[in-house]
Amino acid sequence: IRDSTYTVAVTVTYVNNTTESGSLTVTVGNYKWNSVDLNFGGLTGYVKTSNPVFSPDGKTMYIPTSTPAGHLFAIDVVSGEFKWVFAISQITYGGGALVAPDGTIYQCVRNATINNVYAINPNGTQKWAVKLDAAIGAFPALSADGVLYCLTNKSTLYALDASSGAIKWQQSLDGATGSAVAIDKAGNVYAGTSAAIYSFKPNK
């Protein structure tokens, strides 16, 4: 696809199984870029199930990968060019990333043999890393007062100081396999397992 005008054939099928066909003229303008091969600085990766996330200014896209290792690629959204890649040494299926208002990227990985929560500066350098009691297969959540909540696959909910990675508290929950964590407007924390959904006040 490049800047141009295209004619697209369209067929609509209605609930009564009748159809109607026609064509649409589509104009593509301000074309930026189409696709990019995740290969930069000698590091490659396949995109995992986690979705990409964006910097606060919308200019950088962060893409977590899974194999051959779980690198995090930073791409300029205007040009499609790589800015940097943060290397993680092993396969990291699952997990997820989020971006704080100050631009720090928090990356959780589904691997229990290495550090599995990373804080990465906007320039791609490591801020801190910690190893929790199990792999993390879902997205973390960040509170307005700077607490990062992660739920591991052993169903342990961790509250981490987002600035240092220090563990503020942890709570074992019933059930196996933790889900993503959510925080409401009042700061209450919600975490689900295969057994139940739990709610905690910000100070536990």
Where are these regions (language model features)?
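Conserved structural position at the C-terminal beta-strand
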Residues: V10-V12
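Conserved small/polar residues in nucleotide/adenosyl-binding loops
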Residues: I1-S4
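Flexible "stalk/tail and boundary" regions
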Residues: T27-K204
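Short, exposed coil/turn segments at beta-strand boundaries within extracellular/luminal domains
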Residues: Y14-S23
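Amphipathic, non-membrane alpha-helical rod segments
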Residues: Y6-V8
